[in-house]
Every structure is written in C-alpha cells, then in structure tokens.
Amino acid sequence: MIVVFGSLVLLSIIINIAIIASNGGFDNPARSITIPKEQDLWSPSSRIHDGDEFLYNLTISNGNKNIDNYLINILFRNSSGYWNTEFIISNESKSTKISTQLSKSNLLMKEKQVKNQKYIDILDSSILQIKDIAREPKYLIIGAKWDSINTGILNVPIKISSKEYLSSKVGELETFVLSYKVKNLSSNIWISKNLPLPVKAQIYDEEDKLKYKYDILSLNRHIK
C-alpha cells in the first residue's frame, strides 16, 4: 500500500507540472526545467510608463529588392485606455511625424490612418509586429511556444529558444530570444523582461532573404 500511495503522489505531481507547462504553451513540458510563474509573463504593453521614449535603427526590405534604413523614435504619453503615441520616422531624405493612440492592452491603433499608411505599414511589419505574436501575455521561459507560422506546407512554431546577455547601445541586457526558422536561417527577436518592446530583431523570409532588422539605440524611461 505504501508503494502504491507513493506512486500516486508522484503521478499527481507530474500531472500538475504538465498542466502548468501546457498552459504556458510548452511544446515539450518534460524537457522544461523551470516551472512557469506569473512573474515570467510578458506582453508588449504592460511595462510602458508615461513619457517613455525609445529610438531604434530599422533596416527593412521595401519589396523591390532594395533596402531602406530608418531611425524610429517612439514617445508614449498616458491617456485613458490608450497611449497617446508619437512616432518620428526619419531617413536620409525626409522625416515624418505620426500621432496616434495605441491600446494599452495590445498596442493596436485606435483609428486607421490613411494619410500615413506607408509608414504605419513599416511600423506594423517591424517593431510593432510583436503585438501580432504576443496577442496575450506570454511566458519568457526557454521552450515556451508563443505562436506559429503556417507556410502552406509546414506549421512552424515560434518559441523562446534561449536566454542571452546582449550588448546594446543602452548597455548589457538580459534577454530572451524568440525564434523560428522557415527555411535555413533562424529569425530571432530579443526581448528584455523589463522593457515593453523588443530590443533587437533579425527576420528572414521563406527564401532566407532579410525582411527587416532593428536595434535599440537609446531609451529614456520615466518609472515612478
């Protein structure tokens, strides 16, 4: 009876751990050493503060086999239910300012902006694309599955592949690397637990051609 009771207790523990890991989106719970906790959850909108300002260097393919380079400045101002957000998008020839409201729950734009749609598309398909992957809070735990990409042939998982101390323009950052591989090259997004947006990304298409890459250049935080 003692042996049977001990086996049941062990089985119960294993089942509970598996349930927790499953809720965190783990492909292989048995290989996950760290049990996910609430403080491991991250979302792209939860750590923004009034007055936070970020500057990025963005390189993006324009679809014509050419590469465009931009400086992207993002300033957040607090408002009820939304962040009043100012984007300044600059390249060698011009600078464009866009003022909009982003939802505090998922960074979606409150209203569509027809006038500056070209630049909105640039933002949505690069730095702000994380909102389409992390539609709800996700675990910053190695092995956690965040989403998947359907190529028509394969269903490619997007998951946390590693933890990395990243040297950046704003200092050394502890980051988690969100990765997926459509062909041969791995697409990676570096996320710091205490920042509301990724600090670096390098993304490739199904032909291993660069879609976009960006790095954070500076940040000015207003944590009270």
What is each model feature region?
Residues 113-142:
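Acidic/charged, solvent-exposed loop-and-adjacent secondary-structure segments enriched in E/D, K/R, S/T
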Residues 1-5:
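Short, low-complexity patches enriched in S/T/P/G
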Residues 10-106, 140-224:
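Acidic, serine/threonine-rich low-complexity disordered tracts
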